[in-house]
Amino acid sequence: MNNFEKKIVITGSAGFIGFHLSKMLLESGAEVLGIDCLSNYYDVNLKNARTKILKDFNSFKFLKLDLVNEVDTLNSEVESFSPDGIFHLAAQAGVRHSINVPEAYLSNNIVATFNILELSRKIKIKHLIIASTSSVYGANTDMPFNEEQAT
């Protein structure tokens, strides 16, 4: 996977999947703009350590950014980066937490995704990948899960 000369935006770049995807793409020759708000739902020290590793790559730029409340900065930074694709991995995790603090989910999952969709439309992004969670399958008993099942 060498010479992957693409410019990729990864939201949630300090999370587990975002970090490993960023690292793999950087090692493959991509330029990566990592975006994360570094929320304290998971260990911020771990997120900072992951981001520090990514910053060792010359082709990595990091933005500590809230996808809901800093939309103008998001739009201008991503537009000037001129990406070939976006991996939208940022989200508020935790099913139990969604019951206790539903506003966080509405804001961080729905509004943030809407902002990424609008940005993608505006700059005519060629490739947009939005990650989800197995939680969307709910109490489904059919295994393995597949994309045809009700969510």
Predicted segment positions?
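N-terminal Rossmann-like NAD(P)+-binding domain of SDR-like oxidoreductases, especially those catalyzing
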Residues: M1-T151
